């Protein structure tokens, strides 16, 4: 779990992930990976925990091979004013970049703290849906391809149909997750 503080609440349940990151439970977040998060509060308030020695997609039974964590993390703050024209300019969700892929994280509710109202932190456990998470991952990947690769909506959807893999990230953390993966090599040699 790596995330930042959301702006909607002073105290937040650490189990459901959201636009701020948190308990995303994507095993690809590890050595050599880069995570990008939108900063919602002054100071960002980064937190990390719940490391796994191994985990498959879905974390189906609610746990992975839990372990302690000792690591070196590099935190880089990208000021919003410097992001114009980059893939991070309109980022409002956790984005994972590996050496070979970009991954968008979709959730049942992109911002459950806002969307589900006053009781959101308990309601999220009753309202999660893989269908909703898939729709969110689809929307995020479509926007990513249009905004960062200059594709039309039709081009983005066509490319997603042949080159984007969707997987269930987790179905145990309240705000269920689906990730959309596209290989960077698809764009090798592309002229913008």
Give, region by region, the residue ranges found by the protein language model.
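Short, glycine/acidic-rich beta->alpha junctions
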Residues: 16-21, 55-56, 137, 152, ...
């Amino acid at each position: 779990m790596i995330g930042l503080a959301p702006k909607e609440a002073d105290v937040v349940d650490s189990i459901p992930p959201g636009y701020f990151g948190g308990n995303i439970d994507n095993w690809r977040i590890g050595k050599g990976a880069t995570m990008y998060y939108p900063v919602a509060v002054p100071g960002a308030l980064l937190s990390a925990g719940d490391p796994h020695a191994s985990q498959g997609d879905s974390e189906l039974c609610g746990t992975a091979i839990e372990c302690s964590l000792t690591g070196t993390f590099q935190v880089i703050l990208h000021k919003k004013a410097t992001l114009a024209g980059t893939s991070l300019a309109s980022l409002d969700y956790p984005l994972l970049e590996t050496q070979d892929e970009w991954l968008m994280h979709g959730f049942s509710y992109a911002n459950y703290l806002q969307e589900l109202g006053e009781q959101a932190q308990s309601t999220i456990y009753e309202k999660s849906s893989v269908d909703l998470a898939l729709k969110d991952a689809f929307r995020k990947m479509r926007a990513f391809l249009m905004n960062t690769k200059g594709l039309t909506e039709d081009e983005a959807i066509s490319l997603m149909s042949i080159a984007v893999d969707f997987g269930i990230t987790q179905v145990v953390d309240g705000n269920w997750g689906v990730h959309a993966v596209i290989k960077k090599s698809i764009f090798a040699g592309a002229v913008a």
